[in-house]
A protein has these predicted regions:
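Cytochrome P450 heme-thiolate monooxygenase catalytic core
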Residues: 1-133, 151
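Structural preference for long, well-ordered alpha-helical segments in enzyme cores
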Residues: 22, 80, 119-120, 135-138, ...
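Proline-centered turn/helix-capping motifs that create local helix->coil transitions or kinks
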Residues: 34-35, 54, 83-95, 147, ...
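Cytochrome P450 proximal C-terminal region
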Residues: 44-45, 49, 157-159, 163, ...
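Cytochrome P450 I-helix active-site segment
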Residues: 44-48, 67-74, 92-98, 140-191, ...
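Conserved cytochrome P450 K-helix/beta-meander segment immediately N-terminal to the heme-binding cysteine loop
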Residues: 98, 201, 217-245
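Cytochrome P450 catalytic-core helices
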Residues: 130-155, 267-283
Length: 317
């Protein structure tokens, strides 16, 4: 709350600001503690790991994305590793990390320290990288659509006054805010590709796909299919009214995947988004310079290359 309040009256690069915030939120939620003085180094380690996934050179050579990614992972292993025995000895924490440390398999064995660290690396990366991209996309569209920004501000204020936190029961009241968020994710999917492997032979689009073939779902393509999304390039949150959603194919909107492997963090993402947007819109207007159009990096996770320059204007001005 205080961090967001500090944006008022400033011109900010939104992406790095929100990334630091979501990393801190993820640390508090999943570790039970803030990162403290190591926050910047932890953040950079996650950035390096994600960028390594699309590095052209697939060996960890010096000065390559893969090399930086491997170093980033090694840092996180050293960071999380010593905490495992500490949490096991303590035995009382209710955060996700503590529960991983105490968890037992059906045969009574525990996860190894290496397995726990790998789980935490993935969980922390998933819990802040994609939501950073998603909220940044939403902020970009809020700044472009002042009419919708006013609608969502009114909805947020009706749920809770400025300066007050949303109660859990208030989250469901932000229906138009959720519609706007979903349309932002349709326009800029936080995960441009969802890799899978064919479990059986099948045919699709006139092609025969053998079992074992590496395949991929492209949300970015699916979200622009005119047969499901009339005038797909137009930004329109009313596409997500309950009637519209019921009338549409259930897999026409897949920023979080779908089926049995749908993103487990879906509702955590919605909750974070609503809390962040409530604190922003009840205190300030999001504005951009006339003609401003940032260039976006598409892979591995979309983000504005310049960080997204926003003017955060206090509502009393």
């Amino acid at each position: 709350r205080d961090r967001i309040a500090g944006w008022a009256g400033r011109d900010i690069q939104f992406y790095p600001e929100i990334k630091q915030l979501t990393l801190e939120l993820a640390a508090t939620a999943f570790l039970g503690i803030p990162f403290g003085p190591d926050a910047d180094r932890v953040n950079q380690a996650f950035v390096d790991m994600v960028q390594a996934s699309v590095g052209v050179v697939r060996r960890p050579l010096p000065f390559t994305q893969m090399g930086r990614g491997v170093k980033g992972r090694a840092f996180l292993v050293d960071y999380f590793g010593p905490m495992v025995e500490q949490r096991r000895a303590d035995g009382s924490g209710e955060d996700m990390f503590s529960q991983f440390c105490r968890a037992e398999r059906e045969d009574g064995s525990r996860l190894t320290a290496a397995e726990i660290v790998d789980h935490m690396n993935f969980l922390m990366m998933a819990a802040h990288d994609t939501i950073t991209s998603s909220v940044t996309s939403m902020a970009w569209y809020l700044a472009q659509h002042s009419d919708w920004q006013e609608r969502l501000r009114a909805e947020c204020l009706s749920a809770a006054p400025a300066g007050e936190g949303l109660a859990y029961d208030d989250l469901g009241k932000l229906e138009e805010t959720e519609m706007f968020f979903k349309e932002a994710l349709r326009m800029i999917a936080p995960v441009p590709s969802i890799p899978r492997r064919a479990l059986r032979d099948f045919s699709f689009g006139g092609y025969d796909i053998p079992a074992g073939t590496a395949v991929s779902v492209s949300p970015s393509f699916t979200h622009m299919m005119a047969e499901y999304w009339p005038d797909p390039e137009r930004f329109d949150p009313t596409r997500f009214t309950s009637d519209q959603v019921k009338a549409r194919h259930r897999f026409a909107w897949v920023p979080f995947g779908g089926g049995a492997h749908m993103c487990l963090g879906l509702h955590f993402a919605y909750m974070q988004m609503k809390i962040i947007v409530h604190h922003m819109l009840t205190r300030m207007r999001l504005e951009i310079e006339p003609g401003y159009a940032p260039e976006w990096q598409a892979w591995p996770i979309p983000k504005p290359k310049d960080g997204l320059r926003l003017r955060m204007v206090p509502l009393d001005r």
